[in-house]
C-alpha cells in the first residue's frame, strides 16, 4: 500500500523522533551493572549489582554508578524514567553556548551556525524528560532555542531568492528544519524546472526557425 503524497515527501514527527532516539548520549548511571570493578576484590559489598536484559551487553551491563557512560537516547530516557541515571546535557545546550549561536546567526546573515543535525528535536525531548538535569533554567533555554529557530527560519526564507531549478545550499540545517521546508522547496523547484525546460525548448525552436530562413 502506497503512502499519501504528503507522507512520501517528508518524515513524520514520529519517524524523526525515532531516528533521534537512536543516537548516543552520555549519562551518569545511579546503578552498577558491571559484575566486577577493576581493583575491587571485596565482592559486591554494599553495592547492589543490577543485571539488565539487553542485546547490547557491552554498554548496559558495564555501567558503574556515577561514572559517565554512553548509551542510545531511548535507553537513557527509560533509565531516567526509573530514576536510574542522570542525562548529561550536550555542551551546546547551555545559555552561554546558545547565546553564542544566536550572535553568530545575527552577524552572519548568509550562513548558519554549526549545530547538531538533531538539535531541535533533542532539545525538546530533554526539556520534557530530563529538565532536572540542566544547570541553566529551563525557561531560559526554551526561549533561546525558540529565538535561534526563528532567526534561522527568517534566513531560510531570505535565502529562497537564490533558489534555482537544480540547486539550493542548505549547509548546517537540521533534519527537522529541512523536513519542514522540503515540500515547499520541492514544489518551487519543480515549477522552476518546468519554466527552465520551456525556455530551452522555445530557444531551440527559435534557432531552428532562424536557420530555416
Swiss-Prot record:
Signal sequence coordinates: none
PANTHER family (UniProt xref): DNA REPLICATION COMPLEX GINS PROTEIN PSF2
A biological process from GO: double-strand break repair via break-induced replication
Keywords: DNA replication, Nucleus
Location, primary (coarse class): nucleus
General function of this protein: Functions as part of the GINS complex which plays an essential role in the initiation of DNA replication by binding to DNA replication origins and facilitating the assembly of the DNA replication machinery.
Family to which this protein belongs: Belongs to the GINS2/PSF2 family.
Keyword rRNA processing in annotation: no
Subunit-level organization: Component of the GINS complex which is a heterotetramer of SLD5, PSF1, PSF2 and PSF3. Interacts with PSF1 and SLD5.
Native organism: Saccharomyces cerevisiae (strain ATCC 204508 / S288c)
Protein name: DNA replication complex GINS protein PSF2
Gene Ontology CC terms: CMG complex; DNA replication preinitiation complex; GINS complex; nuclear replication fork; nucleus
Pfam families registered for this protein in UniProt: PSF2_N, Sld5
Lineage, uppermost ranks: Eukaryota, Fungi, Dikarya, Ascomycota, Saccharomycotina
Highest taxon, organism lineage: Eukaryota
Subcellular location: Nucleus
Keyword Nucleus carried by entry: yes
